[in-house]
Design a protein with these regions (language model features):
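Detector for Asparagine
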Residues: 26, 36, 102, 128, ...
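Extended, hydrophobic/aromatic-rich amphipathic alpha-helical segments that build helical scaffolds
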Residues: 1-21, 48, 114-119, 196, ...
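Active-site beta-strand/loop architecture of penicillin-binding DD-peptidases
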Residues: 170-220
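An aromatic- and glycine-enriched ligand-binding surface/loop that stacks and positions planar moieties
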Residues: 2-170
């Protein structure tokens, strides 16, 4: 921004970040496990976390995400900010990204962290009413595209589709709007982008008294790597070596 002395702070950021990266050179390969694990002690890339324990310190976030009480959602701008699988933004990508003509195209070939933060689109059949766990595939192949994809990138009790509420009732689809919800008032949003970052099915969600005990990451080496990359870029020193130390992890 043309301020004097800025390089002093950028140089220090790069130096300090590199020291941390030397001690913690890798990130955890399963992004969603960082936010949905009962124990973060020893997990790759975790620098500091907050531990929760039954009878001592608990929270209700995991349950809330799977109820109608959650109003955590994203904007279209937030969705568009995620890169595509070729490393390019949506404005210049050569991937299969399909723009915003429909939700399937909008989510296609995107950074997997998008899928693990904002629920991808899908649709299933619910033949026995909204308050049941049963479901079937529709006759439209697109409706199962992300059901199949999530089964390959997320663990069985993490971000699998179709999603379910705190009682195990299967949600018919996403986008799932609060004011047009197929008789299912849960796992819904106002704008169509339901945030499910803290969603999992291995944590007990039937108790409304805030008894969840998944640990919370406070500082991750991934954040340090981004700081390093940005500082090196501002200093005009970002090259392949810097990329391989940071954003290519």
């Amino acid at each position: 921004h043309g301020l004097s002395g800025a390089d002093t702070y950028l140089e220090e950021c790069a130096r300090a970040s590199e020291e941390v990266i030397k001690q913690y050179p890798n990130v955890h390969p399963k992004y969603d496990e960082l936010f949905n694990s009962e124990i973060l002690d020893g997990v790759t890339g975790i620098l500091l976390y907050k531990a929760y324990e039954t009878g001592q310190l608990m929270h209700g976030l995991t349950r809330m995400v799977r109820t109608g009480e959650s109003y955590i959602e994203a904007t279209k701008d937030a969705v568009d900010s995620y890169l595509c699988t070729d490393g390019r933004p949506v404005s210049t990508t050569t991937s299969r990204y399909g723009g915003d003509k429909n939700m399937y195209g909008q989510f296609r070939d995107r950074d997997y962290r998008l899928y693990l933060t904002i629920c991808p689109p899908y649709m299933v059949k619910k033949e026995n009413g909204p308050s049941t766990a049963d479901w079937k595939y529709t006759d439209n192949a697109q409706d199962r595209e992300f059901i199949d994809l999530m089964a390959t990138i997320s663990g069985e009790t993490y971000h699998r589709l179709p999603s379910s509420n705190f009682k195990g009732f299967t949600v018919q689809g996403q986008p799932h709007f609060k004011n047009m919800n197929w008789g299912q008032g849960w796992n819904a949003s106002q704008m169509g982008f339901w945030v499910w970052k803290y969603y999992n099915t291995h944590t007990v969600a039937t108790n409304a008294n805030g008894v969840n005990t998944t640990d919370a990451p406070l500082f991750r080496v991934g954040e340090v790597m981004v700081n390093y990359a940005e500082a090196m870029c501002e200093l005009g020193k970002f090259d392949q070596t810097a990329a391989d130390k940071s954003i290519n992890k």
